[in-house]
Amino acid sequence: MMKKRTLGCICGGLLLGAFLYWQNNGLILTKMTYRGEIPAGFDGYKILQIADLQNKVFGRRQEPLLRKIEQSCPDIIVISGDLVDRHENRTDVDGAMEFIHALVTYAPVYFVSGNHEHQSGEWEILEEALVEAGVTVLNNGKSVIERNGDTITLLGLADK
């Protein structure tokens, strides 16, 4: 009886560990179709949103993540905060920018900062690097996108 209980606990622990690993390292692409009113020129328009990476690394040079992004063929990419981790010893602006330099080759990139950017102490450096890479930073701003004679407006509200 004790051996079965011990074996059950070990198996349960292994399953829990595998689940937690997958939760933190799995890449999931969720597709959503907006059913509200949009201009006809934007029919079929794909917006890929990335949030809360917090300097997480998915494979060598983010290759698994970049493959998923490339396969989705987005018209634009929107990063809605927390690209970097706010903790002093884990904020990696260079690593984040390596990812950004790859992203801008797929589609125009728009960025709104999150609390991690502002609390990292590296926001000014990151913002300058993003702009230099061709990213549109929308902190408390907007950008009008035109397609097939129609327009939509992206709004960004910074999280401080």
What kind of feature is each model-predicted range?
Residues R61-E146:
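Core catalytic region of metal-dependent phosphoesterases/phosphodiesterases
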Residues L48, T153-L155:
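Conserved beta-strand elements of the Class I
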Residues M1-L14:
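Short amphipathic, positively biased membrane-proximal segments
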Residues G156-K160:
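Active-site-proximal loop/helix segment associated with metal-binding centers of metalloenzymes
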Residues Y45, D150-T151:
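Short acidic/polar mixed-charge low-complexity motifs
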Residues G41, E146-N148:
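Short strand-coil-strand connectors
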Residues L29-T33, K142, L154:
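Conserved hydrophobic/aromatic beta-strand scaffold that supports enzyme active sites
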Residues G13-F99:
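N-terminal active-site segment of His-dependent metallophosphoesterases
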